[in-house]
A protein has these predicted regions:
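Conserved RNA-binding domains used in RNP assembly and mRNA/RNA metabolism
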Residues: 1-74
């Protein structure tokens, strides 16, 4: 993972991010940790696919399932 991506993700720890997955699901949660494979741990997580909200609590997302990460504005 490039240092630019690491710096962006590092600045988002403890902030809410949205993640688009390969299976067309969209996940929103608070970023807790990440690694060099872009595996992410999130808490207070919600699946917001198809305008339905499902609470997931704490999850680990494998980096190879992530298509896009939407970072907060600040």
């Amino acid at each position: 993972m490039s240092s630019e991506i690491v710096n962006m993700l590092d600045g988002c720890v403890n902030k809410v991010i949205m993640i688009k997955l390969r299976n067309n699901r969209t996940i929103r949660g608070t970023l807790q940790t990440f690694d060099t494979h872009m595996n992410l741990t999130l808490n207070k997580t919600e699946d917001i696919t198809d305008d339905k909200v499902e609470n997931l609590d704490n999850i680990l997302l494998r980096g190879d399932n992530i298509i896009a990460v939407h970072l907060p504005d600040n």
